[in-house]
């Protein structure tokens, strides 16, 4: 049996931390409201997020929105939002989502100050962040203290297995989705039982408009699927982890701080190349789609030379790392060039075009199609990538780093890298 109270005692904020968060948030709200009055703005500060809903874990963040009257132009709330954010967060940094906002720390607590429009139930949203105000109201109206702790357990569980967070880094379960799941199913264990039995797409709400792997409609916005960020891989991880937990409950499923197992690098008899770029100072939701694109371009280059990609991995830490595993570190000396079917009009032209060209053999026929075996020059993968990467865009913020791309060939004795740890330490889930 799992002692859930013991788990909660490790991760639920202490009274001292709650007092600190209240002092900081009250002070920021007071300052924001004072600035709004002095500048004649019809706006007010609102605390949102997990702290406002009482589902926060230790060392959490504070999300404070500046809710403007709905008749303000977007340029005004963007400009004023940044001005106010910088005024209340010394040394805060500007970040960009749907609206620009200010992020920083006060007293060791990470704080985001975000502008939005006021919104009531039934109002049409002006920007996507506006509905966050209603999320707080909805959750607080549907969770009691026990329910809040059930949400905390679900958050701890999803963090432990590596599927917490809707950001592009994870494509997993947002905090709001965890809250809605507990509201829908009643408890942490009921949620786990549901996922342990789920097969195929998880359609908690039936809505043919959405084709995502998981669908749960936002109760404050019927046109939004809260579960849309959940990838098929994250959903699969949740399913198998739920099955394993129910079959053998273990406190390892509630261990957020993973010490990391001792990953042993070993020779797989393949070629493992690591492509590295400098990391721009961007939010995860901006940088990760470009990292995925970078990986996709590398795979496309391999495939264009008939080099089979066995596996891949990415990591974004001090730099951007993309690992690509192939059978060998160079293209095959002979490549099969596919020609047209013999009954097409250009079949004879294809045969004649190869009469005077260097080739290993052919043209020859297999079934109804012509082929030629050609010499490739057997270039190394590194040479191929360095030459052909410039034929593709890898993202508007990464393209400028192509010339400075570093390429490393894996060997067992090389220094430890997070991308190698992830690759060699791949498991059903982190535990």
From Swiss-Prot:
Family as reported in the entry's similarity comment: Belongs to the tRNA nucleotidyltransferase/poly(A) polymerase family. Archaeal CCA-adding enzyme subfamily.
MF terms in GO: ATP binding; CCA tRNA nucleotidyltransferase activity; magnesium ion binding; tRNA binding
Binding residues for ATP: 50, 53, 135, 155, 164
GO BP term, example: tRNA 3'-terminal CCA addition
Cofactor: Mg(2+)
Gene name of the record: cca
Oligomeric and partner information: Homodimer.
Organism of derivation: Thermoplasma acidophilum (strain ATCC 25905 / DSM 1728 / JCM 9062 / NBRC 15155 / AMRC-C165)
Root EC class: transferase
Residues reported to bind CTP: 50, 53, 135, 155, 164
Gene3D superfamilies: Archaeal tRNA CCA-adding enzyme catalytic domain (3.30.70.1550), Beta Polymerase, domain 2 (3.30.460.10), CCA tRNA nucleotidyltransferase, domain 2 (1.10.1410.30), Poly(A) polymerase predicted RNA binding domain (3.30.70.590)
Keywords for this protein: ATP-binding, Magnesium, Metal-binding, Nucleotide-binding, Nucleotidyltransferase, RNA repair, RNA-binding, Transferase, tRNA processing
PANTHER family documented for this protein: CCA-ADDING ENZYME
Function summary: Catalyzes the addition and repair of the essential 3'-terminal CCA sequence in tRNAs without using a nucleic acid template. Adds these three nucleotides in the order of C, C, and A to the tRNA nucleotide-73, using CTP and ATP as substrates and producing inorganic pyrophosphate. tRNA 3'-terminal CCA addition is required both for tRNA processing and repair. Also involved in tRNA surveillance by mediating tandem CCA addition to generate a CCACCA at the 3' terminus of unstable tRNAs. While stable tRNAs receive only 3'-terminal CCA, unstable tRNAs are marked with CCACCA and rapidly degraded.
Alphabetical list of InterPro entries matching this protein: CAA_C (IPR048833), CCA-adding_arc (IPR008229), CCA_tRNA_nucleotrans_2 (IPR042090), NT_2-5OAS_ClassI-CCAase (IPR006116), NT_sf (IPR043519), NuclTrfase_I-like_C (IPR011068), Polymerase_NTP_transf_dom (IPR002934), tRNA_NucTransf2 (IPR015329)
Miscellaneous comment as given in the Swiss-Prot or TrEMBL entry: A single active site specifically recognizes both ATP and CTP and is responsible for their addition.
EC identifiers of the protein: 2.7.7.72
Name of the featured protein: CCA-adding enzyme
Catalytic activities: a tRNA precursor + 2 CTP + ATP = a tRNA with a 3' CCA end + 3 diphosphate; a tRNA with a 3' CCA end + 2 CTP + ATP = a tRNA with a 3' CCACCA end + 3 diphosphate
Binding site for Mg(2+): 61, 63, 112
